Amino acid sequence: MKLPALHLLFLGFICLARSQDNDENVRRIMKEMEVIPEILDEPPRELLRIKYDNTIDIEEGKTYTPTELKFQPRLDWNADPESFYTVLMICPDAPNRENPMYRSWLHWLVVNVPGLDIMKGQPISEYFGPLPPKDSGIQRYLILVYQQSDKLDFDEKKMELSNADGHSNFDVMKFTQKYEMGSPVAGNIFQSRWDEYVPELMKTLYGVSE
């Protein structure tokens, strides 16, 4: 009986070490990719695990196509089932990294998420994927999770996807400070560049192809 117990304990230590390495890696990459302190004061405490289309596991800092990121992803972090969270996705490089005049573009915002159950949260902005303009180069995208003090009353009204108001120039720091959320408890960063799906999404959202 001792050997299986020791084996399980050893596996537990390995999993813990890998988790700590992942958490440290996402903090390092966010600093290297100039998220800290350009966009956030502090990095997330842990790596947010992101899976798109049930097949694509997001690796921090890697580049993916808008086609791969078109549907709302599944998220996983060390959530307290008794707590409420805010989940958001932003692009700080709109319309491009050299001239981010729309920083940050809000792609997703769900508040009052109980534990990991995003479907039971309150959507302020439904998810829509990356929209990097053609010839704009690579853009950064962040998905962040903040722990709320409790279930909160938010002033923000639900945003229409077809209306840029509220989506452009979204200030993450201002929003999270307003509701006293502190630093993100989990987060991840990835990149994307234009592909043929962008005109299709632009036409769906705004009635224009580019």
UniProtKB/Swiss-Prot annotation:
Subcellular location, record wording: Secreted
UniProtKB keywords: Secreted, Signal
Signal sequence annotation: 1-19
Tissues in which the protein is found: Cells at the bases of a few scattered sensilla on the posterior surface of the antenna.
SUPFAM superfamilies: PEBP-like
Main location: secreted
Gene Ontology CC entries for this record: extracellular region
CDD domains noted in UniProt: PEBP_euk
Pfam families: PBP
Protein name: Putative odorant-binding protein A5
Species this protein is from: Drosophila melanogaster (Fruit fly)
